[in-house]
Amino acid sequence: MKPKQRLRSASFRELSLRLVSELSYRDATDVLNRVLHRENRDSVKTSTMEDWVESFGKSLTEGYTAKAEEILDSYHVEKQSGIISEGASLPPSALNPELPAVIGEKQARSLITEYNRGRDRMTKLKYDDLASDIEDGTGRCCYISVDDIGVRFQKPGRKGKCKKGRSFIENTVIHIQAEGKQYTLTAIGMDKAFKLLVAFLLENRLMEDYRLVFFSDGATCIRDNIEKYFGFRQYTIILDWLHLEKKCNEFLSMGIKGSKDEKQRIKKELASILWTGRHQNAINYLDSLKKSQIRNAVKIEELKDYIRRKSPNLTCYALRHELNLRISSNRVEKANDLVVAARQKHNGMSWSKNGSGALAVITATMINGELDGWITKHRISYRMAS
């Protein structure tokens, strides 16, 4: 323990942690000193608070890692990497799950017929096997959203003016949802986050006869890690609808010309086609644009290439929407806001790796309802929260 760091009661520690997760260290210590009527030599110092929070966060991160490695070891999974390979003692229901019910051909055709009423040819749904393979929403599905969020890295001993091209610390946040319950994991480094995820799914038996559905913004590193850690069994990746729509609009804003209404019409028509999941129809639509509508043909080609690259992870968003199934990774984006962005991405802020990671894991632990157990018993339950 560093000089001036005092032993703290459980309630004092919890109050301190909740304050620093919402406020700057300066504001948090100011509130504490006002509440506790501490002044001058007896006051809580900002630097002392920051050092203690980083130390607490490091201990908490080690607690999550130790719990994960204990779980992995019990399944004979290599605990340093978390990658499931030959020799792992997983139940057959995890290795070769009996997947829950899908909507099937009859329901799919009925939904498509109803959806197509009054729509033009390009935006109509067309039945295929993929449509009938959508989960019906009543079976055992585990929805996993993965995202990275970068905060500015504070270099030690900065001199002179800040250089261009700042470095960033990447916090990986993973949100897990199943049967009305949820849990949030975070780590600096995607490999570390996925190791925690594998252990969490094993501990909660969420790989045993569960359909795994991943949502992401389409980043290659996320897709590659999903295959790296879950390639031994079934899984589905769905490209987040809001990200897809935003990305297409960005390309179109640079690639088309005309009146505001005309450009908006083109964006809306392309979105309507992609809503059905028919990526080739979307490419055909872009090919049909007149030269008078195109400002930058290179951007239109880049958009077509983007749609082709992401086509394996496009789904029939329209049918999923009709079935009240998820089409977006907005839950992990909300988790990102709570765990990282709300506290760490204000203008002018920069962070050390330990400082950023500490605040992120502390906030995630609060969201999961695990903070009291760690403060009082040094225990992580690793169980889903309602």
For the regions a language model picked out, list residue spans one by one.
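Catalytic center-proximal scaffold of phosphoryl-transfer enzymes
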Residues: M1-S386
